[in-house]
A protein has these predicted regions:
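Extended, low-complexity, acidic/polar intrinsically disordered regions
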Residues: 1-221
């Protein structure tokens, strides 16, 4: 194994460990009295049970000892994508899935995220487009999680794909929705939208020339 491969494996292990630590904190809330804490935790437990069951049913060589390796970031991402894209997913499960997605995404390899970005973006566009469509406390948390997903998706768009952000209607529409939340009456939602805009427009890779900089200035004028 060469140096590059060693670094790649090390980074993957670090991301897995970081995600496991984050999910462990959520898992402990499965018996919480607060619905917006309990629901994502219970969904996480259900997802992990499904992933473990799938791992145990995979065919193996006759003499190979069964060793079930914990699911990694990509497996969690695929499970959440499946829930978010299903037509029969309830509003509550959708909301919990978006929250878990905001936790998982930063730990998934950028190439995998880019391959799934269009579907994931569509999944979070709905709550952003209807920011008052649910119970107040649950909706606040759902919006902040959706903004976290958008930030993660924007963060991994390479500079060479500038035209994707400039031309794709879904991206433009989502950015406009984010800008609208910058003047939302709810302080936590407004603050999270401000953070997203500030972080994305100031990313060093774009050298202060992000595709949405002018659009944001025109909106603020």
């Amino acid at each position: 194994m060469n140096t590059a491969d060693t670094v790649s494996v090390s980074n993957a292990q670090e991301q897995r460990e970081a995600l496991m630590n984050a999910l462990e904190r959520i898992r402990h809330l499965k018996d919480s009295k607060l619905e917006n804490q309990r629901a994502p935790a219970q969904l996480l437990v259900a997802i992990e049970a499904t992933l473990a069951e799938r791992a145990n049913t995979q065919p193996q060589e006759p003499q190979q000892e069964r060793q079930t390796e914990p699911a990694g970031p990509t497996q969690y991402l695929l499970a959440l994508e499946s829930l978010l894209s299903a037509e029969n997913t309830s509003a509550d499960v959708h909301a919990s899935s978006v929250y878990l997605l905001s936790i998982v995404l930063p730990h998934v390899a950028p190439g995998v995220v880019r391959a799934k970005s269009h579907a994931l973006l569509g999944a979070v566009a709905a709550p952003l487009a209807d920011p008052h469509g649910g119970a107040a406390e649950n909706m606040n948390a759902r919006l902040r999680a959706s903004l976290g997903v958008v930030e993660s998706l924007l963060h991994i768009v390479p500079v060479r794909e500038r035209n994707v952000l400039e031309r794709e209607r879904t991206w433009l529409a989502v950015w406009d929705l984010v800008l609208g939340l910058c003047i939302d009456a709810r302080p936590k939602v407004r603050r999270r939208a401000h953070e997203l805009v500030t972080h994305i427009l100031s990313e060093p890779a774009w050298e202060h020339a992000h595709p949405y900089a002018d659009r944001t200035m025109m909106w603020a004028a």
